[in-house]
A protein has these predicted regions:
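Glycine-/small-residue-rich active-site loops that bind phosphorylated ligands and cofactors
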Residues: 14, 41-45, 74-75, 99-102, ...
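Histidine/acidic residue-rich metal-binding segments in metalloenzymes
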Residues: 80-194
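Glycine-centered flexibility sites
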Residues: 12, 22, 29-30, 69, ...
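Alpha-helix-loop-beta-strand connector modules within alpha/beta enzyme cores
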Residues: 47-68, 112-126
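Hydrophobic faces of well-ordered beta-strands that scaffold small-molecule active sites
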Residues: 2-6, 34-36, 65-69, 94-95, ...
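Hydrophobic alpha-helical hairpins/lids featuring a short glycine-rich hinge
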Residues: 39, 56, 60-81, 87-89, ...
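Active-site mouth loops of central-metabolism enzymes
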Residues: 4-17, 40, 66-79, 145-153
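Metal-associated gating/positioning segment near the N- to mid-region
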Residues: 1-60
Length: 194
C-alpha cells in the first residue's frame, strides 16, 4: 500500500510533522511505502537534503520513504533544481508540490530531464495568476458566504498545458488533486492517445 503524497516536514518544520511521526502514522494506516513532498526548509532541491531524509528514514525503519525532489531551486520557479544529482541520490519523481511552475519553457526542460532520467513528474495544476485571491470553488455557496471563488479554468489550463508538455517530451506525468470535469476529460483523452 503506497501513499504517493505525504508531508513529512523534516527538515525545517518539525513542529508540524517529523519523519518518525509521519512514518508511524503511515505504518499504523497500513502503508508500506510513502513519497514525501519536497516542501521543507531547506527545500529538497539537492542531493544533500535527499540523503538527509533517506538516512533519517532508514534509522526510523518503519516504512519505505521515497523522497520527491523539487522541480526548481527553493521551489521559486526560476531555475531548475539539481534533478540529475537528486536522481543519483534516489528520488523517483519531481514536484513543485502545492504550486505549478508557471514558466512553461522551464517546466518543459524539467520534463525533458525527467523523461531522460526515467522519473515521474507529479503536478499540482493551478494557474496562480488566475487564483486572484480566491479561497474556494466559484459557485452559489461561495456567493452565499461572500467568499471570492476560484473558477475551474485555474486548474484546467495547467492540466492542458502539462498534458501537452508530457506528450511532447515523453515525460511520465501524474496529476495530483484533479477536481474538475474538464480535467478528468483531458486525462481520459490523453490516456486514449497514449
Amino acid at each position: 500500500f503506497i501513499d504517493m503524497h505525504v508531508h513529512l516536514r523534516d527538515p525545517g518544520f518539525e513542529e508540524k510533522e517529523t519523519i518518525e511521526t509521519g512514518c508511524r502514522a503511515a505504518a499504523h494506516g497500513g502503508y508500506t511505502t510513502i513519497l514525501a513532498m519536497p516542501n521543507t526548509k531547506p527545500v529538497v532541491d539537492n542531493p544533500d537534503v535527499v540523503n538527509y531524509v533517506h538516512n533519517k528514514a532508514k534509522t526510523v525503519g518503519l516504512v519505505n520513504v521515497l523522497q520527491v525532489g523539487a522541480v526548481t531551486k527553493n521551489q521559486e520557479g526560476k531555475e531548475l533544481a539539481d534533478i540529475e544529482g537528486m536522481v543519483k541520490a534516489g528520488i523517483p519523481a519531481i514536484s513543485e508540490d502545492g504550486k505549478s511552475v508557471m514558466n512553461a519553457q522551464l517546466y518543459r526542460e524539467a520534463m525533458e530531464k525527467a523523461a531522460k532520467l526515467g522519473i515521474v513528474v507529479l503536478a499540482h495544476c493551478e494557474d496562480k495568476n488566475l487564483v486572484n485571491g480566491g479561497v474556494m470553488n466559484e459557485d452559489e455557496h461561495a456567493r452565499e458566504l461572500g467568499l471570492k471563488g476560484i473558477t475551474n479554468s485555474v486548474e484546467d489550463i495547467i492540466v492542458a498545458r502539462d498534458i501537452m508538455l508530457s506528450h511532447d517530451t515523453g515525460a511520465k506525468l501524474h496529476l495530483c488533486h484533479c477536481s474538475t470535469e474538464d480535467s478528468v476529460m483531458m486525462v481520459d483523452l490523453a490516456k486514449q492517445k497514449n
